[in-house]
Curated annotation (Swiss-Prot):
Cellular component terms per the entry's GO annotation: cytoplasm
Pathway info: Lipid metabolism; phospholipid metabolism
Record-stated family: Belongs to the PlsX family.
GO-annotated molecular function: phosphate:acyl-[acyl carrier protein] acyltransferase activity
Catalytic activity: a fatty acyl-[ACP] + phosphate = an acyl phosphate + holo-[ACP]
Cell location: Cytoplasm
Function, in words: Catalyzes the reversible formation of acyl-phosphate (acyl-PO(4)) from acyl-[acyl-carrier-protein] (acyl-ACP). This enzyme utilizes acyl-ACP as fatty acyl donor, but not acyl-CoA.
Protein name: Phosphate acyltransferase
PANTHER family xrefs: FATTY ACID/PHOSPHOLIPID SYNTHESIS PROTEIN PLSX, PHOSPHATE ACYLTRANSFERASE
Tree of life domain: Bacteria
Quaternary structure and partners: Homodimer. Probably interacts with PlsY.
GO biological process, one term: fatty acid biosynthetic process
EC identifiers of the protein: 2.3.1.274
Length: 346
């Protein structure tokens, strides 16, 4: 049995999307047990529509719901101990839940997660890791918005954590990792990126294969299993990809409805277009993982639909089932030991 705590008030639509999304996840994974946190007047009527889910779940009342526009400091002051977001995170800390999922305010969720769960040993800053559809299948991209900027040490930690997530999620024994840069040549890029690359080249690692620098177009190609960057660049890349996917879907729709011949052609090609649309749908790959914390927290898109929230829950389910935290902690300990040994020899 895997227990997942849910911030039922998170996102643009709150319980009206969160609970149907959880119900979809429960249908697919009957071994999930949910703990919902939220305002009773809003959560209980929606939960009552799903009797099977309600029977297999627990509801705990909250006093406060964190707004999507609340500043992190404001959210901490107003919501600590009594908001649905805080209580869902705290359930992971106390061991009541194995993972937390929220579609709420990203800044508030990160601030509360850091304050409540603390960081893993030797990790300086957290990263948000996202699952990215590629020509080869899927890749991990991090950081996609936890913090702006990162030094070489932090980028290396991201690489180790991203590889651990790829191993857990994709069941790859030795994931390939690349540092996002403006070119693949070793002389290009910012000093911190070049230094991180040098550290990864010089340190022997069983858990990942460093593939050097990768460029923006390599993300969609699936050149590596995990792409590492800092949060400012990663978030721009994410939003650009999401916007491009929606643009392509709209352009296809317009093209296929322009003439009678195009409409007839669409009838025969509908299956292929539906598969393409599904692969490009952000809801199908929803769920950013907060890496570097001493507990599993999953961030769903605030505007996700029920299918999208279900995807975020499934990411949390897979992270728990594949023992993500234990693997990442072991990888980081091994890396820091190996790097200190290499540094002492230099």
């Amino acid at each position: 049995m895997i227990k997942i705590s849910i911030d039922a008030m998170g996102g643009d639509f709150g319980p009206e999307v969160v609970i149907p999304g959880a119900a979809k996840a429960f249908e697919r994974h009957p071994d999930i047990r949910f703990i919902f946190f939220g305002l009773p007047a809003q959560v209980e009527p929606v939960l009552a529509r799903y009797p099977k889910l309600k029977e297999a779940s627990e509801f705990r009342a909250s006093e406060v719901a964190i707004g999507m526009d609340d500043k992190p400091s404001q959210a901490l002051r107003a919501g600590r101990g009594k908001s649905s977001m805080w209580q869902a995170i705290e359930a992971v800390k106390t061991g009541d839940a194995d993972a937390c999922v929220s579609a709420g305010n990203t800044g508030a969720l990160m601030a509360m997660s850091k304050f409540c769960l603390r960081m893993m040993s030797d990790v300086e800053r957290p990263a948000i890791a996202g699952i990215w559809p590629t020509l080869r299948g899927e890749s991990i991209v991090l950081d996609i918005g936890a913090t702006i900027g990162a030094d070489a040490r932090q980028l290396v930690d991201y690489a180790v954590m991203g590889a651990g997530m790829a191993r857990a999620l994709f069941e790859v024994r030795k994931p390939t990792v690349g540092l996002l840069n403006v070119g693949t040549e070793e002389v290009k890029g910012l000093d911190e990126i070049k230094e991180a690359g040098q550290i990864l080249r010089d340190t022997p690692l069983d858990g990942l294969e460093y593939s050097g620098f990768v460029e923006g177009n390599d993300i969609g190609k699936g050149t590596v299993d995990a792409v590492v960057t800092e949060g400012f660049t990663g978030n721009i890349a994410l939003k650009t990809a999401e916007g491009t996917a929606r643009q392509m879907a709209e352009l296809l729709r317009q093209a296929m409805s322009r003439t009678l011949l195009a409409k007839i052609g669409y009838v025969f090609a509908k299956g292929a277009f539906d598969r393409l649309r599904e692969k490009m749908d952000p809801n199908k790959v929803n769920g950013g993982v907060f890496l570097g914390l001493s507990g599993i927290v999953i961030k769903s898109h605030g505007g996700a639909n029920a299918e999208g929230f279900c995807s975020a829950v499934e990411v949390g389910y897979d992270m728990v089932r594949n023992r993500l935290l234990e693997k990442i902690e072991a990888d980081l300990a091994h890396f820091h030991h190996s790097h200190s040994h290499v540094s002492s020899k230099a």
